[in-house]
Amino acid sequence: GKLLKTIDTHALGDRPRGIKASPDGKHYVVSLEYGDKILLLNSKFKALKTVATAKGPYGIAYDKSGKRLLVAAFKSKELQVFNGKTLKLEKTVPIGDRCWHFTFTPDEKNLLIACGRSHEVLVLDGTTFETVGHVKDLNLPWGIVAYPKAMGSLDFAK
């Protein structure tokens, strides 16, 4: 691909870890690990605002509807669920150690979270975000994608 723009995030928070377009294409969200923030950009990549997160935001993704924005805050061992439009925090869910990336299943019935230092993939209900299962004894799982493509921190389906 072609480089569209370089954005200096140093004043806002360093170490961008994830970027996702909103399903409607009007915004981008960026997780800033060394600022414990989400950076909201417009479609021309202008910074609009930052929103505080738990410690260590990493994986970031919207659900298909754009109503929810999820952030895996690995240092806090939390999954944060934000309102996809207002970016107000709606729910915090305890998760495992070093949970970096996640994906919804294609039907969005479940959310799968790769938890590296817990050596497992957590299976959460896709609506309540309660833990419904575990895939254990894995060797440092870092990322996860679903097939057919789904909404997640490493994949994007429309």
Outline where the language-model segments fall.
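Predominantly soluble domains enriched in secretory-pathway, periplasmic, or organellar proteins
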Residues: 1-158
